């Protein structure tokens, strides 16, 4: 196993020189110049080891002909070693799939009210109508003075509706003033565009978000963590389908994610209450007698707020030298950063953070555990590209994953890769994975990609007014352009007789690439994920051993602009594999429309000329 791992690692760890080439100016860069913004200077990528620099010696080209099918942890081990990112051991019994939006909300409420020591949250925004959720947080803090709360949101999205109406910021700002020794509220703003700047006012609140967002979705309670792609608003709690994975009693992973949120909080604005002090005092003194509809509490959640830059100096908590989270005053001090020109400092801090946790996880990882977890960060504007650096490794891995050693009687002599995104605009790297010649040229070891996108009606912007109303059609156009490439490469038609007997939507032999659309009456679709089921000697049904779950939509925005966090999870637990299989099957049961050239040419799928022009112009922002 070690020999195979080392040889494959040598092959896939270093083909990144092209990834470090300077990209052409992206649309936000051009728009920034036109709006009078100063484009960001390139960040020098100071990789943690010599093996990750453009000046490294060439990697060995000696690679095994095939990856053994019975080594389930080979992929996470290669990713961790090649990218120098941490890998955690876990038990599948501690991992619970939350199956629906309503159960996601009830799980959040339950964990808020039972948390004893800490709650840490990273989300795009909290819905301005979520007063009940805010009330749960308020009462939990009032009842447990030892409880610490850290919330990180996006500055542009959390303040979008203000000051004309309530917003995420107004909903929560009172918490930091009501519990000053327990609460840190932070709003992250892209280094490209600062809140309330002249440029941001010219561009407008709705379009400011195109320059980059804090997009991570991490919800932590003591040592439990929920990783998902869902935000905290009414649609996500009722009728917007997503994925949610609860990982219980995993202190190292919880500390890693909490420390990550605290690190980014150093480069974020503090959210402060700026309303009536007497109202704040009154609500705090009578909080146990109120509910979320009490008039004074409603007024409090609509109060004024302000943003304050402290460079992280006022944070209550920090990562200690052993990786635990402790009172900031007891931890090694960090230098406060300025409100401007902090990009290189943030990049270095994230690189140091990753290397620190890589070494720590490697030293502390127990040999036991049937599951491995590799967190992958993506902050393109800060030159942190762990998720996209993983894609060439995955491509090499899949091209080497061969069932030939299983013999001619293998029950499942092929690999399936299920990939979905609610916003189907695959970046160049993900397209290269799906369309890879290295993967599809092996007729003896076929890999089948099954893609699921949201139908126009399941797109969250369906029926919107103005420019937003064109977004579903824009995604239809992007799907069509992608499908044209699939057809051009002749990957749309079956070339093997293999049929997935466990697929509820099976229509016969598998094609190298299949594209379907998800649709469910009254619902919108926000799932994103990747599942890999490798070859098997005795198991003919779908049984994913690897999944990717988190906030990334796998598009250009996720790659270049937004702050993303995903978990690459590999398990040898049959129970967890069954759970992942059920997740895929439920997704595919609602993906009844199989896309083909005729469908894209139909009258219902025609995209008007204006939308076509706008889509091509704004494609990096979708």
Where are the regions that the model predicts?
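Active-site cores of enzymes that catalyze phosphoryl transfer or operate on phosphate-rich substrates
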Residues: 57-96, 101, 292-400
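Short acidic, glycine-rich surface-loop motifs adjacent to enzyme active sites
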Residues: 116-117, 121-124, 421
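Structured alpha-helical segments in the cores of large, soluble enzyme domains
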Residues: 104-108, 112, 390-407
């Amino acid at each position: 196993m070690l020999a195979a791992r080392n040889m494959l690692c040598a092959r896939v760890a270093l083909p990144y020189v092209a990834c470090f080439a300077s990209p052409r100016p992206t649309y936000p860069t051009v728009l920034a110049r036109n709006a009078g913004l100063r484009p960001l200077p390139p960040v020098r990528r100071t990789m943690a080891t010599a093996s990750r620099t453009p000046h490294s010696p060439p990697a060995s080209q000696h690679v095994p002909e095939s990856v053994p099918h019975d080594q389930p942890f080979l992929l996470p081990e290669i990713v961790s070693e090649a990218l120098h990112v941490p890998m955690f051991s876990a038990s599948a019994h501690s991992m619970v799939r939350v199956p629906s939006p309503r159960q996601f909300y009830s799980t959040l409420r339950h964990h808020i009210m039972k948390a004893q020591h800490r709650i840490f949250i990273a989300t795009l925004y909290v819905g301005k109508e979520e007063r009940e959720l805010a009330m749960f947080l308020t009462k939990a803090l009032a009842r447990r003075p030892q409880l610490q709360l850290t919330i990180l949101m996006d500055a542009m999205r959390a303040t979008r509706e203000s000051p004309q109406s309530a917003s995420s910021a107004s909903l929560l700002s009172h918490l930091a003033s009501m519990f000053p020794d327990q609460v840190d509220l932070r709003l992250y703003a892209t280094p490209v565009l600062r809140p309330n700047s002249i440029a941001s006012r010219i561009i407008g609140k709705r379009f400011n978000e195109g320059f980059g967002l804090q997009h991570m979705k991490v919800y932590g309670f003591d040592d439990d963590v929920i990783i998902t792609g869902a935000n905290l608003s009414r649609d996500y709690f009722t009728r917007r389908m997503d994925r949610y994975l609860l990982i219980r009693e995993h202190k190292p992973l919880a500390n890693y994610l909490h420390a990550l949120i605290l690190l980014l909080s150093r480069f974020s604005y503090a959210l402060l209450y700026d309303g009536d002090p007497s109202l704040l005092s009154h609500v705090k003194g009578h909080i146990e007698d109120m509910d979320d509809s009490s008039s004074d509490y409603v007024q409090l959640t609509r109060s004024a707020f302000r943003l304050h830059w402290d460079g992280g100096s006022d944070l209550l908590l920090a990562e200690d030298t052993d990786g635990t989270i402790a009172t900031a005053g007891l931890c090694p001090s960090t230098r406060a950063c300025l409100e401007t020109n902090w990009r290189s400092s943030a990049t270095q801090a994230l690189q140091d953070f990753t290397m620190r946790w890589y070494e720590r996880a490697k030293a502390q990882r127990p040999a036991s555990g049937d599951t491995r977890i590799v967190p992958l960060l993506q902050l393109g504007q800060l030159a942190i590209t762990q998720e996209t650096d993983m894609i060439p490794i995955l491509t090499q891995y899949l091209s080497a994953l061969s069932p030939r050693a299983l013999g001619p009687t293998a029950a499942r002599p092929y690999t399936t890769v299920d990939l979905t995104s609610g916003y189907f605009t695959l970046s160049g790297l993900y397209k290269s994975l799906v369309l890879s010649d290295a993967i599809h040229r092996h007729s003896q070891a076929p890999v089948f990609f099954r893609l699921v996108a949201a139908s126009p009606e399941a797109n969250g912007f369906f029926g919107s007014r103005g420019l937003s109303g064109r977004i579903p059609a824009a995604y239809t156009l992007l799907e069509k352009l992608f499908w044209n490439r699939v057809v051009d490469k002749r990957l749309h038609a079956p070339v093997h007789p293999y049929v997935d007997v466990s697929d509820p939507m099976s229509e016969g032999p598998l094609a190298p690439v299949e594209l379907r659309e998800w649709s469910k009456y009254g619902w919108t679709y926000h799932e994103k994920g990747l599942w890999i089921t490798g070859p098997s000697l005795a198991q003919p049904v779908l049984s994913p051993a690897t999944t990717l779950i988190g906030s990334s939509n796998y598009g250009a925005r996720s790659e270049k602009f937004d702050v993303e966090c995903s978990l690459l999870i590999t398990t040898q637990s049959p129970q967890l594999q069954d759970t992942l299989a059920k997740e895929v099957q439920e997704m595919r049961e609602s993906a009844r429309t199989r896309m083909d050239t005729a469908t894209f040419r139909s009258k219902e799928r025609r995209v008007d000329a204006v939308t076509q022009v706008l889509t091509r112009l704004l494609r990096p922002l979708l």
